[in-house]
Amino acid sequence: WPGMDKIRDSADILQPEKEETYQFIEKLLSSVKENFSTNRVHLGMDEAVMLGLGNYLKENGYKKGSLIIREHCNRVVDICRKLELKPMIWSDMYITANSTGGYYDLPENTDCSKWEKPKKDLGLVYWDYYHDDTRTYEKMLDIHAQLSDNVIFAGGSWIWNGISPNYSKTYACTKAALSTCKKYNIKEVLCTAWMDNGAETPVDALLPGLVLFAHLDFH
């Protein structure tokens, strides 16, 4: 919206390191705190591939995305502390901004010792709805363990690939994911369901995936 121009970096990204941005974010989070009983909040921040390359670049010059995301997250975490909220974000920006590949493209035994890392009280949510092999989950959880000891996993109940749910993919991916999460002692997992590709599948069709998640959490 035109009214947001002053705090826009690019079409779908807020401009970091701008006080008006953090004033806006604090108002958003204050509203969340007032209207929900939980003190936990998922801040999103995923797939911001153009971070720092829009108005931020024009006003400040080039800065590495890994530095921008770390400093921005630190500011937002400070706001969450002020409001007594416990935040989490999708983890992909901490991986893609620190490397040259895609989220899942890093080689095994990747060394993250020189990467920019989040504050300890910011949960990193590793999201993966795609892989049915435990090796990928092991690789990704090894990488996440180097970034944070506050790691959460998010899988999915597949209702977003057409007019019917994809239960076979839900089963294969969830079985591989949750068995690996147990091996790595991940304490918290989420089951997501998205509305991509026209949202043609009835939402209630996600329920078998939720039951599978619940079953595999304990068996």
Q: Where do the PLM segments sit?
A:
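Second-shell loop/turn segments in exported
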Residues: 11-17, 60-65
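Substrate-binding groove of N-acetylhexosamine-processing glycoside hydrolases
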Residues: 22-34, 38-40, 47, 58-219
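Conserved radical SAM core fold
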Residues: 7-14, 50, 131, 158-160
